[in-house]
Amino acid sequence: YSCICNQGLRVLESPLKREGNTYVVDWDDFEAKCADKKTTLFLLCNPHNPAGRVWTKDELARMNEICMRHDVKVISDEIHCELIMPGYVFTPFATVNADCQRNSVVFNSPTKNFNIAGLQIANIICADKEWYRRIDRAINIFEVCDVNPFGPLALEAAYNESEDWINELMPYIADNYALLKDTFAKEVPSYEVLKLEGTYL
């Protein structure tokens, strides 16, 4: 959170709570934190890193309803969006409904999904014209938009020509997760491996 703190702002966390072998939103705490008059942005990790949750459409809609009730904008980090375990479906925040689209800024990148982090390429998706203007100004002031010349080419190739990569990668990750669960169950049964819905962390 250094980029937040370096601007003289404060991070206010709303921890997830354990429920069975997964984590869920503590809705009472989340609403209370959004109701804080100093809260202006909600940073969402979708899917969640490191809890491995793939948020449902209903959960995302509820998050946004609470945020809008308290005039809080949603920043949705969707960098792990392609890394979804079999049986789960990723829902982009801005596609949930029109309010979610209007009240969000989405950050995405092929870097995690396609192992190209060194090329430093990402996307910012924003429907709100005023927020778009502010973001464009900020990334130019802080010089974070200097593009690696290979980045755009890699991004296009990842999104347009790499479906086979993801189709082969996810069963591999699922097998590794199954191996991890099995190994812990046999060798360290006192440790529980939580359900993994998405990401590889």
Labelled PLM ranges:
Residues 1-11:
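Substrate-binding/gating loop at the entrance of the active-site cleft, primarily
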Residues 120, 146-169:
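Structural motif of enzymes handling amino- and sulfur-group chemistry
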Residues 16-88:
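Active-site phosphate-binding strand-loop segment of PLP-dependent enzymes
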Residues 149-152, 156, 171-181, 192-201:
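Conserved glycine-rich beta-strand-loop-beta hairpin in the small C-terminal domain of fold type I
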Residues 9, 69-73, 101-102:
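A short helix->loop->beta-strand "cap" motif at the edges of active sites that frequently abuts
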Residues 96-134:
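Active-site PLP attachment segment
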Residues 133-140, 158-181:
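Structural signature of PLP-dependent enzymes
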